[in-house]
Amino acid sequence: MLVIYFIGSLLASLVSARNAADLIGTWTTKSRQVFTGPGFYDVVKDELIEPRLTGISFSFTEDGHFEEAFYRAVSNPQDPSCPKGILQWQHGTYTVDSDGSIHLNPIAEDGRQLLSDPCSSSKGIYTRYNQTEKYSSFTVDVDPYYDSIRLNLYSFDGSPMIPMYLAYRPPEMLPTGPLQSIVSKKAKRHFDSKKVTPFGLRTLISKDNLVDPNRWLWVGIVMSAMGGITLFFT
């Protein structure tokens, strides 16, 4: 009898972990510096706002809207001490299929991307961004280490993304409809040729990025180089 009860409870928890309602809220990676909403994208000025550290944030509403904010570092094989940075923001609608996969359908005109290469250019490149996305599955559970509700997303190929933790419920988001009517006319007029100040180099390396094993090699090279410089001057 106890075995049957245990199996039933386990199955119930697994079903709950795939419940689309569990997605509702704003999620962020462990740096807790990147959040969707007006703190990441200023619609009126049409500007992306650089967070203190890199990270990822997703928001989902009960009626099928999403918003995402990415601040990523991209390794530079020619100069590992000089990574590039990318800010990306988009929003739109989402669906959850019966197999647990998530489909994100962004509003094409609203997405924004800022690419910064501070070691080769004094200006960042600001463009529109529109990327339909699919996540093969997701789970929501309680992280025993952080004692927080954790969202585990899996990319289209099944590879896990960096875990995200519940930050707000209800979610912190910009208006879910098209934003082009809000963007100032001045911002629209200069958008196609817009160049902005690049990110600060110190923000492009954070704990979130160290989770990716492919970056450990470059981190090791940078640290070895820094150690050599320290030894030389001591």
Swiss-Prot record:
Residues 234 are cytoplasmic. Keywords: Endoplasmic reticulum, Glycoprotein, Membrane, Signal, Transmembrane, Transmembrane helix. One of its GO terms (molecular function) is unfolded protein binding. GO terms for biological process: 'de novo' protein folding. Residues 1-17 form the signal peptide. Belongs to the ROT1 family. InterPro entries: Rot1. It is found in: Endoplasmic reticulum membrane. PANTHER family: PROTEIN ROT1. Required for normal levels of the cell wall 1,6-beta-glucan. Involved in a protein folding machinery chaperoning proteins acting in various physiological processes including cell wall synthesis and lysis of autophagic bodies. This is Protein rot1. One of its GO terms (cellular component) is endoplasmic reticulum membrane. It comes from Emericella nidulans (strain FGSC A4 / ATCC 38163 / CBS 112.46 / NRRL 194 / M139) (Aspergillus nidulans). Glycans are attached at residue 130. It holds the Pfam family Rot1. The chain crosses the membrane at residues 216-233. Its main location: endoplasmic reticulum.
